[in-house]
Amino acid sequence: MMKGQIAGLMKQAQQMQENMKKAQEQLALIEVEGVSGAGLVKVVMTCKNDVKRVSIDPSLLAEGEDKDLLEDLIAAAFNDAVRKAEATTQEKMGSLTSGLGGMAGMLPPGFKLPF
């Protein structure tokens, strides 16, 4: 490889690193909502998996309501939020990995980036 090509790759890697840092900061601000029980339970979390709110419809807290059902609905809403956060993260970060250009061929087969 020529000296200029190496310098170009290093500059490209540094720019990508800066872009990834900015994207990760943005992901910490993006909120997704997981829902279960036709909207009776909602979980709002960031794409960095920080739970911000849990909302439970008052009808689920009424006397005689099934505790196990409520627990299942909370778990389902949480899992829904996690899936949405992962999908959003992949979408946002995917544009960065497509910018690898010539560096993509340097990664080992099967190598996965940490996001």
Curated annotation (Swiss-Prot):
Keywords in alphabetical order: Cytoplasm, DNA-binding
Major location (coarse): cytoplasm
InterPro entries: YbaB-like_sf, YbaB/EbfC
A Pfam family annotated for this UniProt entry: YbaB_DNA_bd
Subcellular location field: Cytoplasm, Nucleoid
SUPFAM superfamilies per the UniProt record, alphabetical: YbaB-like
Coiled-coil parts of chain: none
A GO molecular function held by the record: DNA binding
Lineage top rank: taxon: Bacteria
The keyword DNA-binding is annotated on this UniProt entry: yes
GO annotation, cellular component aspect: bacterial nucleoid; cytosol
Oligomeric and partner information: Homodimer.
PANTHER family assigned to the protein according to its UniProt record, in alphabetical order: NUCLEOID-ASSOCIATED PROTEIN YBAB
Family membership noted in the UniProt record: Belongs to the YbaB/EbfC family.
Its job: Binds to DNA and alters its conformation. May be involved in regulation of gene expression, nucleoid organization and DNA protection.
Entry protein name: Nucleoid-associated protein Rpic_1036
Record organism: Ralstonia pickettii (strain 12J)
